[in-house]
Amino acid sequence: MGLAMARRFALEDMNVVLSDIDESKLDAAVNEIRGNGGNAEGVVTDVALETDNVQLLDASIDAFGTVDVVCLNAGVQGSIGRSWALSNEDYKWTLGILLDGVIHGVRTFVPHLVEQDQGHVVVTASIAGHISSPFGAPYNIAKHGVATLAETLFHELKVERSNVGVTCLCPGFVNTNIVNATAARESGAVGSAVDDRGDQMLEFTQRALSGGLDPEVVGQQVFDAISNNQFWLFTDEDWDEPIAARAEQIVQRSDPRLQRPS
């Protein structure tokens, strides 16, 4: 989805800085944007490291003078399986990218935006930030955390009377390679599925993503949300009823029921 956002921004003659931990993929994305007439720079970044986030901000300012839109979008599926079968490393690695990465991004970039009193932050959460499916505990934990961080940030900026906007992007199934991103782990690390339940969930997720929304549609949705200063951005309406049903279960103090898209 990040590349789709960059493509859409470049169509508006926005200067684009892309980041990725995979240098070859990053170079290909930068060359594509430039090949289509856009201005783009690439910075190899491990979002789980605070120092890399600081370097990304510095490189962006060095390249283009300022930063106006920040998209905290790095994503992996992470390890999946029974929550008690996952190792501490499984949790740590997934949360490091999905949650710590966003925390580092907020702490690094938001002060710059607040100081100039303009700009926008796009935080990529997920439907998994509102619905808890089984056998994906690290991902669910991270996305619930990211959603509440975005909402907290929104309230704080309003209290501060800042002109900086926030969008919380909550994708459903989008045709991306997020599952394959787990392969970027260091050699010898535990794979994405740690048990038979993980295998089943991985197969389901891959099928669902392959039939999911075109990332280019999401890129347009993000651009529109920024333009309209819209906070909640859900990529489709398939999960509206399940989210409402979960909220009602909480209000009624009833046991959770497994939710599926309508």
Predicted regions and their residues:
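Residue(s) in the substrate-gating loop at a strand-loop-helix junction
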Residues: 126
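Active-site helix of classical SDR
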Residues: 106, 142
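Conserved glycine-rich Rossmann-like NAD(P)H-binding loop of the short-chain dehydrogenase/reductase
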Residues: 12-28
